[in-house]
Amino acid sequence: MLVSSLIALALAGPIAPPAASAHLARCGSEDDAMAELADSALAIPVAGVQPGELVDSFRFKRSRGRPHQAIDILEPIGTPIVAVTDGVIVAVRTNRLGGKIVEQLDETGCVGFYYAHLDDYAPGLEKGQLVTKGTLIGFVGDTGNAKGGPPHLHFGAYHLADKPGKFAWKKPLNPYPMFVVPERS
């Protein structure tokens, strides 16, 4: 059921989320999606990076006052980048700001993940490919508007519940709490 739904999502575009998915809370409100993502043990997208090494750079001001809709994970060029969860690759391309980028939908189609500034893609990675958590998708780089700066992965997450299966940048989610559990006193 899940595999057939992901294939349909990759080939046909927006569809209703699979009824059997254990992650349907991601298709509710943004708060519900954040809570479920934080509880779901996502893989940190850069190999070898631990939660304590992450910096919450979400909403930091960028050029022309635009907010940063992601977190940046600084690592050397060529460090492996992996899929944070099961899903489908919906874009492997380049753009002006992100350079070499990959877009992934989670298994519900209600959350999209954006990986940018890649030095290169994993061999054979292509649009429509099903991936599991931890699948190699590329390598840290400095492409796009990161050229000349420190190499890093620009990692974004987006809530797509209003149009499941259609990647859009309208509702950014802060990825930092998805990986870092707050200390309890």
Residue map of PLM features:
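Generic beta-structure capping elements
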Residues: 57, 76, 107, 118, ...
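Sec-dependent N-terminal signal peptides
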Residues: 1-14
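Zn2+-dependent peptidoglycan hydrolase active-site motif and core
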Residues: 84-127, 150-154
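Surface-exposed, glycine-biased beta-strand/turn segments
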Residues: 13-100, 133, 142, 172-185
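Conserved, short, structured surface segments that act as functional micro-motifs
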Residues: 103, 129-185
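Core beta-strand residues in small-molecule sensory/regulatory alpha/beta domains
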Residues: 74, 82, 124, 130, ...
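Solvent-exposed loop/turn segments at secondary-structure junctions
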Residues: 60-61, 80, 94-97, 108-111, ...
